[in-house]
C-alpha cells in the first residue's frame, strides 16, 4: 500500500490496455485511474475507478482497511472512468453514504439509478471524519458541470478530480518525488489541451477559488500525486487556461504526393533562418491530432497547408481545423497555404475557417500553388515563413 500522508492512502489502478482515452486520445503509455482512502474514525473513499478494474480496486481497498466498512464515498467527478465502480462499491459496502453536490446526485441517478443514502453538499460545505475535516469547493466545467474538489486543509491535501491530471500509467512510483516526471510534463499539456482546453475561463475561476490555500499534496484522478512540483503544476494550468504561449511555430501540412510537404519545408527553413528556434512540423495524416493540439497550445505561431481535394479542403486538415474551433483555442498567429491541380479551393477554405471559426491574427500572404513548386512559389513560401518569424520575434 502507498500512504501519501497521515492516513491518506492511494488505492488507484493502472490501465495499460486501453488504446484511446474516451475512444479518442491515444494512450501509448497507458493511464491511471486514481482513488484514495482516508482511514479515520470514519472511512472515506474519494472517487472510484473504471469498472473493468474493480477486482484490483477492491483488493487495494482491503489492503488498507481490511474488513472495516467504508462510511462515505466522495464523488468529485462523475465521468465513468471515476464513477464506474459505484454500483459495485455499494454492493460490497451496502451502508456507504455517497457524497456529492446537486448536479452530482442527478448524474448518479441517471447513470446508476442510485437515489438512496446520498449526502448533498454545497460549495464550502464540510464533512468531519474525525481527525480529518473535509471541505468541498465546486469548480463547474473543469471539465464537467458537476465537478468539485475536496480539501483536507489540516493535512494540506487537495483531492482535485481531473484537474492537474495527465496521461500515463504510474510505473511503480505514485508520488512525484518517486518518479522521473520528465515523462509526464508533455502528457499533462496533451491531457489539458484535449480534455480541459475548451474551458479556460472555468479553470481560471477554479484557480481563483483555490488561491491562497496552502497545499502539500495534490491528489488528481490521473497521473502522479503532486508534492514536489505543486507550484509548477498550478503554474502550468494557470498559463494554459490563460492561453499564454511561447514564441514558437507549429507547421501542419496535409500532402498526397509530397508537394505541399515541400512547401512546408521551405516555410520552416525560412522561419528558422529568420530566427525562430522552436519549430515543430506535423504531417497531419500521420500524427494524431491530440499531439498537434498539444503543441499548438504551447506555441503562438501556426501555419497550415493542404491540397484541394474533391473541390474542397483535404479531409485531415478539415478535422484539425474543426478540433481547433471546437476547443476554442485562442491567442494565435496564423499563416496558410495550399495547392491544387486544376481548381483552387484549399486556400479559400482555410481562410473561411479562420474568418468564421478560429479568428486568429493572419500573418503574411497565403500561398496557392498550382501543381508543383516554381521559383515564384518558392519565394512566396519563404516570404510567408519570414513574415511569421518577424511577427513572433516582435511579440
Report each predicted region and the residues it spans.
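Conserved beta-strand hairpin/beta-sheet module of binuclear metal-dependent hydrolase folds
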Residues: 2-65, 149-152, 156-160, 249, ...
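Structural motif
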Residues: 42-44, 72, 156-159, 217, ...
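Active-site metal-binding motif and surrounding structural segment of the metallo-beta-lactamase
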Residues: 41, 52-99
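Short acidic active-site motifs
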Residues: 85, 288-292
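Terminal amphipathic helices with adjacent charged low-complexity linkers/tails
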Residues: 222-246
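Active-site neighborhood of phospho(di)ester-bond hydrolases with catalytic His/Asp-centered motifs
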Residues: 46-48, 71-78, 98-102, 158-161, ...
Amino acid at each position: 500500500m502507498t500512504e501519501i500522508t497521515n492516513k491518506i492512502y492511494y488505492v488507484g489502478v493502472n490501465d495499460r490496455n486501453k488504446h484511446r482515452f474516451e475512444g479518442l486520445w491515444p494512450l501509448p503509455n497507458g493511464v491511471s485511474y486514481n482513488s484514495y482512502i482516508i482511514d479515520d474514525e470514519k472511512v472515506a473513499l474519494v472517487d472510484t475507478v473504471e469498472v473493468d478494474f474493480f477486482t484490483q480496486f477492491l483488493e487495494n481497498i482491503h489492503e488498507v482497511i481490511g474488513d472495516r466498512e467504508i462510511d462515505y464515498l466522495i464523488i468529485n467527478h462523475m465521468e465513468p472512468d471515476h464513477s464506474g465502480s459505484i454500483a459495485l462499491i455499494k454492493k460490497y459496502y451496502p451502508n456507504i453514504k455517497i457524497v456529492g453536490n446537486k448536479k452530482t446526485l442527478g448524474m448518479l441517478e441517471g447513470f446508476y439509478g442510485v437515489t438512496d443514502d446520498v449526502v448533498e453538499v454545497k460549495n464550502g460545505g464540510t464533512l468531519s471524519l474525525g481527525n480529518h475535516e473535509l471541505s468541498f469547493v465546486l469548480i463547474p466545467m473543469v471539465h464537467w458541470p458537476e465537478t468539485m474538489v475536496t480539501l483536507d486543509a489540516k493535512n494540506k491535501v487537495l483531492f482535485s478530480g481531473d484537474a492537474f491530471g495527465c496521461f500515463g500509467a504510474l510505473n511503480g512510483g505514485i508520488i512525484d518525488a518517486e518518479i522521473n516526471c520528465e515523462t509526464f510534463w508533455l502528457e499533462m499539456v496533451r491531457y489539458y489541451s484535449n480534455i480541459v482546453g475548451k474551458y479556460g475561463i472555468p479553470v481560471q475561476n477554479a484557480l481563483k477559488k483555490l488561491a491562497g490555500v496552502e497545499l502539500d499534496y495534490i491528489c488528481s484522478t490521473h497521473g502522479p500525486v503532486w508534492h514536489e512540483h505543486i507550484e509548477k503544476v498550478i503554474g502550468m494550468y494557470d498559463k494554459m487556461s490563460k492561453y499564454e504561449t511561447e514564441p514558437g511555430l507549429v507547421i501542419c501540412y496535409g500532402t498526397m504526393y509530397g508537394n505541399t510537404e515541400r512547401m512546408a519545408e521551405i516555410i520552416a527553413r525560412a522561419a528558422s533562418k529568420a530566427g525562430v528556434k522552436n519549430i515543430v512540423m506535423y504531417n497531419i495524416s500521420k500524427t494524431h491530432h491530440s499531439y498537434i493540439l498539444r503543441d499548438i497550445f504551447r506555441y503562438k505561431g501556426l501555419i497550415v497547408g493542404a491540397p484541394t481535394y474533391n473541390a474542397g479542403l483535404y479531409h485531415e486538415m478539415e478535422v484539425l481545423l474543426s478540433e481547433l474551433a471546437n476547443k476554442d483555442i485562442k491567442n494565435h498567429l496564423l499563416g496558410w497555404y495550399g495547392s491544387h491541380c486544376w481548381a483552387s479551393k484549399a486556400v479559400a477554405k482555410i481562410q473561411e475557417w479562420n474568418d468564421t471559426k478560429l479568428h486568429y491574427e493572419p500573418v503574411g500572404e497565403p500561398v496557392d500553388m498550382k501543381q508543383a513548386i516554381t521559383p515564384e512559389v518558392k519565394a512566396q513560401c519563404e516570404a510567408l515563413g519570414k513574415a511569421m518569424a518577424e511577427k513572433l520575434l516582435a511579440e
